[in-house]
A protein has these predicted regions:
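Acidic, serine/threonine-rich low-complexity regulatory regions at protein termini
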Residues: 1-142, 146-276
């Protein structure tokens, strides 16, 4: 048979050029590069700051930067959540007793909520850095409240008032000496962003509901007694308190606007909400 005939009758696979195979592994990175980005957790939120542009007291132009700064410094002012392991004479129950006493004393003096939160923060940060004896625990507490009142209040109670609530257990010289020492240990850093700061921001997305705000403040206050919350930033405590208050009062779902102004989605709050469960 002629060679020409054999060429004509050659199989189709031999007559057509082979197609290059696609390398799946080579394409994968490119496919990943064009993936649709995840949906923001606050997608669909409403801008409530735009209504305050003409109000200089609301500083709408700077409010985002202000709270971004607060979220930064709140991490710098958090105590060691396990500081009791370095204390020889103290335990968490004694810390709870001190917190109860400070809450009661704070109420007697009718001080601002910020004063109470700062006082407990000073106590916990100081005890994270120094070991003390049981006999000095109340001195640390009363001095911390004295420091916080000076920092937050317009009219700070006199040192004689603090001597009275301490039942004469310390002299004014001891409190003043403790004040100097504690501030030195803390490097004079009292720039604490308390849950109250973040509660005000979140309340904006809650239409400043007075009932929700009041119940949330109650939850925030009792959180001071529970040492298990020391590892959680104040912004998270505030958001969880508002979420729980809204649940109790049946105020509806955790909206994208609440997510935006609190910076926490609902699933980020649940671990803190259920922290007291067995």
């Amino acid at each position: 048979e002629a060679p020409e005939a054999m060429a004509v009758d050659a199989p189709r696979a031999e007559r057509e050029p082979k197609r290059a195979r696609t390398d799946v592994h080579a394409v994968a990175p490119a496919a990943q590069a064009v993936q649709v980005p995840p949906r923001p957790k606050d997608a669909g939120w409403e801008d409530l700051d735009k209504d305050d542009v003409d109000d200089p007291l609301m500083v709408a132009e700077y409010v985002e930067d202000i709270f971004a700064y607060m979220r930064k410094i709140e991490l710098q002012c958090m105590p060691n959540g396990n500081y009791m392991s370095m204390q020889r004479d103290l335990n968490w129950n004694l810390r709870g007793v001190l917190a109860d006493w400070l809450i009661e004393t704070h109420a007697k003096f009718r001080l601002l909520p910020e004063t109470l939160f700062l006082a407990l923060n000073v106590v916990d940060r100081f005890l994270s850095l120094r070991t003390i004896s049981l006999s000095k625990l109340q001195l640390v507490g009363v001095t911390a409240l004295f420091i916080a009142a000076k920092y937050e209040e317009v009219l700070c109670p006199s040192i004689q008032n603090f001597l009275y609530v301490a039942d004469g257990g310390y002299t004014s010289e001891e409190i003043l000496r403790a004040e100097r020492y504690m501030l030195k240990v803390l490097n004079f850093d009292l720039s604490y962003a308390s849950p109250m700061n973040f509660l005000r921001r979140i309340s904006k997305a809650d239409n400043y509901d007075i009932q929700t705000r009041t119940v949330a403040k109650y939850f925030m206050e009792i959180s001071l007694v529970d040492h298990r919350l020391l590892d959680h930033p104040p912004s998270l405590v505030a958001a969880a308190a508002v979420w729980l208050a809204r649940e109790v009062l049946e105020r509806g779902e955790w909206t994208p606007t609440l997510v935006h102004y609190s910076t926490y989605a609902e699933d980020e709050l649940l671990s803190l909400i259920h922290i007291s469960e067995p």
